[in-house]
Each structure stands twice: as C-alpha cells, then as structure tokens.
Amino acid sequence: MATIRMFNAVRPAIEKVDRIAALPYDVYNRKEAVEVVKGNPDSFLAIDRAETSFDDSVDTYDDKVYAKAKELLENKIAVGDFVTEEAPMYYIYALTMDGRTQHGFVACASIDDYEN
C-alpha cells in the first residue's frame, strides 16, 4: 500500500504571485522561453527553463542548466520571493480548461511500491 504524507510547500509570496506565475514549461520552445524571461525575469519560467540563462550553444539538458535552476530557486527563496508553508499540509487543486474541470491531490509519496 502506498504511503503518503503532508509536506511544507514552497510557493510564491502573495505579493509576487502575479510576476512569478507562468505557463507550463513545455508550451514554449527555447526561443519563446527566452523572450518571456527577458520580458519578465521574475517569471518561474526562468527557473523552469533555466537554459534561458545561457546562449544556444548550451544544451537544454546540460548539467549546468540544472545547477542554474537550483541557484535561481535558492536565490528566490533567500530574497523572500518564495515562502515555505509553516505547517505541513495536503494540497487539493482544480484546473478548468474549455469547460472541463480536473481535480488533483498533492502529497509526498513513498517510492517503495515502485522499487518492487
């Protein structure tokens, strides 16, 4: 049986949400992502598509891209753009698109069932 537990989410500070919120990373090609980040460096896309910090000679999957994403996220946390929830919780969400609503549940889950 799967083991799940609550966790302390890291999320944008309320006063920064409008600048940080971004569409999913996979709706942009690299060139489009660069333009979005250039227009709004606070966008989460700068972290999600950290290759936007490098020229085109750096592969999207290069280790330094992942290191840059880590650096950017840690910096956003350090300056208070992201906050950590004080108490662990489960998270429930609803997404609506084209009149169809999808509900979800977010929690920490053990990987033990996948290792067997």
Describe the predicted segments one by one.
Residues 1-115:
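A cross-family signal for N-terminal binding/gating loops and helix N-caps
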